[in-house]
Amino acid sequence: MKISLVVPVFNEEEAIPIFYKTVREFEELKPYEVEIVFINDGSKDATESIINALAVSDPLVVPLSFTRNFGKEPALFAGLDHTTGDAVIPIDVDLQDPIEVIPRLIEKWQAGADMVLAKRSDRSTDGRLKRKTAEWFYKLHNKISTPKIEENVGDFRLMSREVVENIKLLPERNLFMKGILSWVGGQTDVVEYVRTERVAGISKFNGWKLWNLALEGITSFSTFPLRVWTYIGLFVASISFLYGAWMIIDTIVFGNPVRGYPSMLVSILFLGGVQLIGIGVLGEYIGRIYLETKSRPRYLIKSRK
């Protein structure tokens, strides 16, 4: 039985040898043929030469190097494109997702699950801000989007070959892999685990990238941000109508003069702000449509030297 590990890497020269040694020395994985697909996402350090050297000595190591930095989501998709295992497991090279969890994932898969999610029961290794923003994102996404995604589940999971082949059929270029992996469905099971500290290096995923990923997730799987502006427009129009009616009554019935520029200026600024926000939301969706219509490849792989 063949198990494929999909491992995106970006400037991870310190972590790769530790990860490789840990996988190959882990006794519970030795009964399986374990393929390791490294995806070098445009690293500037020795990452490329390290994974190429591993591939020379180990035929089950598949080294892929992008022509530039395309991002983690395209790297994950590239890994899925190039795996050959009966089951596929995306995993981070920093070993925050412990190798010891993999046999439990395999056990659930062999029991009949198409996808086995690895759920973090303890996120104390993440900062408080990251934990809270992740919690808010999951709640918002699952309230307005379909399908829902399991809270505290990252990319670390096991997928059957059938699930992987279904994912590869999807044509979109703007990728939110957590949503895509949930969208394909199938019989799903969950394994809980405790996330550990990184074995080496530092995280390359900063707050700005997380923010953009959250936007990608919401706009890829929900039209609610567009629909909500219809309701806002109706609300503002209703308030304006009622205020206008009150001004007429106040002037004709009570004889009060119409208030001048201050109220008008406030109204103009308020409506201008609302319109700009609405245009911004609309622009997010139009921008994604524009990128999709170009039909550019998700990634480019350079040949090995």
From Swiss-Prot:
Topology in membrane: Multi-pass membrane protein
State which Enzyme Commission number(s) the record gives. Answer: 2.4.1.-
For this chain, the family text in UniProt reads: Belongs to the glycosyltransferase 2 family. GtrB subfamily.
Against InterPro entries, the record matches this protein to: Glyco_trans_2-like, Glycosyltransferase_2, Nucleotide-diphossugar_trans
User: Where found?
Assistant: Host membrane
Q: Which UniProt keywords apply?
A: Glycosyltransferase, Host membrane, Membrane, Transferase, Transmembrane, Transmembrane helix
Q: Which Gene3D superfamilies match?
A: Spore Coat Polysaccharide Biosynthesis Protein SpsA, Chain A (3.90.550.10)
Q: What does this protein do?
A: Involved in O antigen modification. Catalyzes the transfer of the glucose residue from UDP-glucose to a lipid carrier.
Alphabetized Pfam families for the sequence: Glycos_transf_2
Species source reads: Shigella phage SfX
TM stretches of this protein: 229-249, 263-283
- Any one Gene Ontology cellular component term annotated for this protein: host cell membrane
Gene Ontology MF, one: glycosyltransferase activity
- What would be the name of the gene that encodes this protein? gtrB
The leader peptide range reads none
Major enzyme class = transferase
Would you tell me the protein name for this molecule?
A: Bactoprenol glucosyl transferase
